[in-house]
Every structure is written in C-alpha cells, then in structure tokens.
Amino acid sequence: MFPNSILGRPPFTPTHQQHNNFFALSPTLYSHQQLIDAQFNFQNVDLSRAVSLQPLTYGTVSPIQTSTSPLFRGRKRISDEKAFPLDGKRQRFHSPHQEPTIINQLVPLSGDRRYSMPPLFHTHYIPDIVRCVPPLREIPLLEPREITLPEAKDKLSQQILELFETCQQQASDLKKKELCRAQLQREIQLLFPQSRLFLVGSSLNGFGARSSDGDLCLVVKEEPCFFQVNQKTEARHILTLVHKHFCTRLSGYIERPQLIRAKVPIVKFRDKVSCVEFDLNVNNTVGIRNTFLLRTYAYLENRVRPLVLVIKKWASHHDINDASRGTLSSYSLVLMVLHYLQTLPEPILPSLQKIYPESFSTSVQLHLVHHAPCNVPPYLSKNESSLGDLLLGFLKYYATEFDWNTQMISVREAKAIPRPDDMEWRNKYICVEEPFDGTNTARAVHEKQKFDMIKDQFLKSWQRLKNKRDLNSVLPLRAATLKR
C-alpha cells in the first residue's frame, strides 16, 4: 500500500530474542500499543533524511532489504483481495523473522453476534534497541461473554434491528482500517521513530457502521514518560511534517491530504486502496481512553448498539450530525444516548467510572486501557423496554424533558448536572461533558440557528414517530441502507 511498508526488519540479537522478565508486560491488544520510553526532539526532525528510501543500518546488523515485488515498481497497487489476501499484504520483507499477522477482530462477524466481546488477539513484546517495530507473539485468546441481540417485540423494533444488522461495521471493514494503520505507522516512524499510531473512535468502540471513517491518534511519546503536546504549536508542527510526507512520498496511495487547523488539528486523507476516509490527530490520548470506555458501554447491554446506530443514522439524515458544520459530532450523540439510558426510572446503563474507577482511571497507562472491557461483567437491568420504545423515549427526552439552558449531560455522573460557570461552558447552547477530561464535546454548536434546528428536529421526529410507529417516518430505510 505504501512504499516503505515493504521495508524489512533486521534479525534481533540473541539477547533480545530471549524473554526478559524486567520488560515483561501484561498482554496487549495491538502491535502499536507498546511501551515506548526513548526520548526524541520533534523540533529537530530532518524531513529530508527521514523520508529517504536508502537502506537503513542498525549497528552491526545487515541493512534492510527492499522488496523486489512487482507490486511496488512504481505502479499502482493491485487491489484484488482474492489475488492477494490480507495476511500476505502485511509481510513484504526479506527477513527470516517475519512478523506474525495481527488481526483485530473487535467487531463480531455475523456468527459472533451472541458474544458481547468478540475474540481478540492479545500480544506482548520484547523491547529492542533498534528503531523498528518490535516482534510480536500471539498468546491465548480471551473467552468472549455470551450475549444475544434483543428480540423485536413490534414493527418499529424490528426495523431498528434490521437496519443495525445491515449497516453495522463488519470484521472485513475493520481489517482494512487496521492494515492501513499498520502501514501508515511504518511510514510515520521514518519521521518519528518512537511514535505509535492508534486506531480509535467508532472503528473500535462498537458503534461503527460500514460507512464509518477511520480515526487515528499519533502518539509521539507514550506513557509513563508521556508529555503533553501543545495542540496549537507542537501538534501543528508535527502534522505539518506528516502532511508534507503524505503529499510528497505517498501521493500514489493517499489522496486529498488536508491539514485542518482546528482546536485539535488533524490531517484528513483518503486511502485509495480501501477507499476509507481518515482523520489523524497528535497525542489526543483522551480519544484512546474514551474508545474503550464506549466499547464497554456498547457491549454491556444488548440494546445499546442497535439504538446508537439508528440514532446516528437519523441525525445524519436530518443534517444534525456534523461538528464541522456547527451541529453534533457522532461522539456527542453517543454520549447523549448513553446519558438517556442512564437516567431512565429503571436505568439500562450505570456509570462505569463510578462502579469501576480503577479500570477507567486516567492513571491507567495507554498500553493497558484495552483491558477495561474484559473486566466488566454484563449489566442486568430490570428495564424491559423495546428498542422502539427506547427510540421514542430518547427523542421525547431531549425534545421535552432535558433543560438545555441549565443542565449538562454527564455520562460520568450518570445524570444531568448543573452547568459549570467556567468560560468554556458559559453561553454554550449544548453542554456534553467529556468523561475523562471534562471538556465540552458539543462546543461546535455555537450558533443559535443550528441549536434551534437540532431541538426542532428532536421535537418533530418524536411527534411523527409517536403517531406512526414506523421508522420510515423519520428515517427512510432504503436511503439509510444504501449509505450503510
């Protein structure tokens, strides 16, 4: 996919191939979630040297050999999945120590729907002194928890379930994103050798659809030696280098790379092979933490994922699900759904951060945050409401019950709480608390016109759905299914 993803990795010295108890860590989930503690100075990055394709040497080790594969002789990559399986795409180097294929099966296949936690490959690593991705070894899979999708008790609930089963992200979709992430990480490590690239957001949190974009977080320095990156200066400088690298070295594989200078700057681009749109940020590590918090909520109760997906589809259809245009982000919408399910007379969800503070503490190191979903048992709610009733209740709650002027949505507290009087919250139309850093995830809604449009859509959709009890009345199913 990318020219430097074919670079090999030199064999490790015998001492580094042996297990070392000093560096032994708990099993980790991804090849890119590994403890890094070497120092670097991004201000002094030499881009001209970093992007060089000359063979690299590591001490007395032989230089890396580049592939002679015809796929990379200046021609566009062949995208026939059958002719070149995914597993094979990840091993294009001449090394006797090939890196085992790591497959993220975080989204269940159709045969895995009874599981709340799909099978996960866990890995651990042996640190290495050279600047390359350490070798990985598989360890036994975790046993998933059994869970069934809810029964459809009425027409509206059946429509919600059918839309969910059609549009939910598949394992094949996730594999494409993970393949791109792994190869991009190798490219970016030419600029920042100690960096790691994390796939975050809806791709991993259980709420993704087949059409979901990929969100990437570039961590230039991981914990415990993690430092804060100033998003206005350092992050923009780092992303400028990444953007330049994409434009100059990867133009044949990435299209439309664009540097967005927002509060949290990002590089937007599209992978030509998988046709997936990506957003890449720097050291916005709260996104890694909330990915696994949301994933735990997603699989805690079997009505959560179908309800969230249909609400995201509904909001997108009515043009109120686009933070770049002054409406609600998908993340804010998910938090709004979780908050509603927490505030019912018989709650469907609890506050995980209150019940399991040690699992969702910000003191948990990044390479361990993926353990949280595995440590939380299913939540047994006495609430037996159907999916249709819950969708109606969600629309009614925000149309007629929630006080937008004085209240803030808090999943952390599992209730609506008074707005803070800080500048960040003052004069804001919608306040949704980020569970980890306490910021306002709905700060993009800064125009009264957009706020009124959002409230109006909640009210109209609730009234229409209450009268007709047909999902088509608020979300045309044919159009929603075609978008997937």
From Swiss-Prot:
Q: GO: which molecular function terms?
A: ATP binding; metal ion binding; poly(A) RNA polymerase activity
In the record, Phosphoserine modifications are located at S62, S69, S95
The family annotation for this protein states: Belongs to the DNA polymerase type-B-like family. GLD2 subfamily.
Family annotation (Pfam families): MTPAP-like_central (PF22600), PAP_assoc (PF03828)
| Gene Ontology terms: cellular component | cytoplasm; nucleus
Please give the cofactor(s) recorded in the UniProt entry for this protein: Mg(2+); Mn(2+)
Map motif Nuclear localization signal onto the chain: 76-92
Q: Name one GO biological process term.
A: hematopoietic progenitor cell differentiation
What residues does Mg(2+) bind to? D213, D215
What is the deletion mutant like? Mice are normal and healthy. Poly-A tail elongation in oocytes is not affected and mice are fertile.
Q: Top EC class per UniProt?
A: transferase
Q: Does Cytoplasm appear among the keywords?
A: yes
The record describes its quaternary structure and partners as: Interacts with CPEB1, CPEB2, CPSF1 and PABPC1. Interacts with QKI isoform QKI7; promoting recruitment to miRNA miR-122 and miR-122 stabilization.
Described by its record, this protein's role is as follows: Cytoplasmic poly(A) RNA polymerase that adds successive AMP monomers to the 3'-end of specific RNAs, forming a poly(A) tail. In contrast to the canonical nuclear poly(A) RNA polymerase, it only adds poly(A) to selected cytoplasmic mRNAs. Does not play a role in replication-dependent histone mRNA degradation. Adds a single nucleotide to the 3' end of specific miRNAs, monoadenylation stabilizes and prolongs the activity of some but not all miRNAs.
Q: In which tissues is it expressed?
A: Ubiquitous. In brain, it is highly expressed in the cerebral cortex, cerebellum, hippocampus and olfactory bulb.
Q: Which Gene3D superfamilies match?
A: 1.10.1410.10, Beta Polymerase, domain 2 (3.30.460.10)
Question: What is the recorded name of this protein?
Answer: Poly(A) RNA polymerase GLD2
Provide the PAP-associated domain boundaries.
386-440
Q: From the UniProt record, list the reaction(s) this protein catalyses.
A: RNA(n) + ATP = RNA(n)-3'-adenine ribonucleotide + diphosphate
- Cell compartment(s), UniProt: Cytoplasm; Nucleus
